Amino acid sequence: MDFIEYFKVPKAAKIIDVGGGDSFLVDHLLALGYEDITVLDISEVAIDKAKERLGNLAKKVKWIIADIANFKSSQKYDVWHDRAAFHFLTEKKEIQNYIDATKQGITIEGILIIGTFSEDGPKKCSRIDITNYSQDSLNNLMKDSFKNVKSIYVDHKTPFNTVQNFVFSGFKKI
């Protein structure tokens, strides 16, 4: 939410939450009056949990069950939010497909917000290999179509009392 507030995203903006499944971003966006929200996740179970939690509010959200590594958007979004889906892509082709999807799926001047495990973060997530990033490595991947506006490193404390270091970057499409 900090990046969405930082970028002063208008309430009518088209927002997609990639890997949003059962996260609470959609709850916060709805509570703040955002009107055009899409949640994409590979897990139908996670999406069903979010729908159940939201009750009737779930009808205000577009839900997409898809693998982001092969996703081709049929529309353009003003905000593409991804907290920790991108780092699950470990193959060059998957990473390039994702970057191509952002280029195609985000409006000019649109916003790309990505959070991944940093280079100091865990090397696996839920026992699955991931790709770690730094602010510079994310910038290098996105530089052809996006300008970095803000990056921060954040220590996230898990329910298991461990700390995971993330890098969050906000980009504008150029």
Report residues per predicted region.
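Short, conserved loop/helix-junction motifs that constitute active-site signature segments
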Residues: Q104-T107
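Class I (Rossmann-like) S-adenosyl-L-methionine-dependent methyltransferase catalytic domain
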Residues: M1-Q75, L89-A101, I111-I174
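A conserved beta-strand element that flanks and buttresses the S-adenosyl-L-methionine
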Residues: H81
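Short catalytic micro-motifs in class I SAM-dependent methyltransferases
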Residues: A84-F88
